[in-house]
Amino acid sequence: DVDVGDWVLAIGSPYRLNFSVTAGIISAKARSVPGQGTSYIPFLQSDVAINPGNSGGPLFNLDGEVIGINAMIYSNRGGYMGISFTIPINYAQEIIDQLREDGFVKRGWLGVSVQEVTKDLADSFGLDVPRGALIGSVLTDSPAESSGLKDGDVIVDFDGNEIIYSGDLPMVVGRISPGEEVKATVYRD
């Protein structure tokens, strides 16, 4: 299990400097990468220095266990700025297994655009705190439309996973096999 504040190590070959080790801490869990659109992966965010040549390398905890695969940095100037993103190892393993078995990655798809639930919206839905994913639009011929979801619905649980932020929904949906039926808890005004 990975917790915010855990020390981590990355091994890679930044700029062809083989077997380089950098250290840092886990800054956040279940992050979407800013500016990358919909994310199906709840990235680990850390301050481990990741540069060209580190992507695809392992991120270790201090027990020597691989906890993720280093994927990318967030930068407005192209170089490391202290924000790195790592694919959690359980997600990486699922992707590897699907690639070995099928040759491609299968992701569930709901067919909605979502936004955060504000305090005012939470009050109008009778939610004790702002949480969930507010459906802004439902695509035609999508699983969401087929299941009866509508613009303005708020999804607070999907397949037994609590949806706190709107970005949680695609991460949960993406792990479900296409065509699989699931239960959701939805508030409708």
Where are these regions (language model features)?
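Serine-dependent protease modules
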Residues: 1-147, 157-181, 187-189
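Conserved catalytic motifs of ABC-family nucleotide-binding domains
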Residues: 152
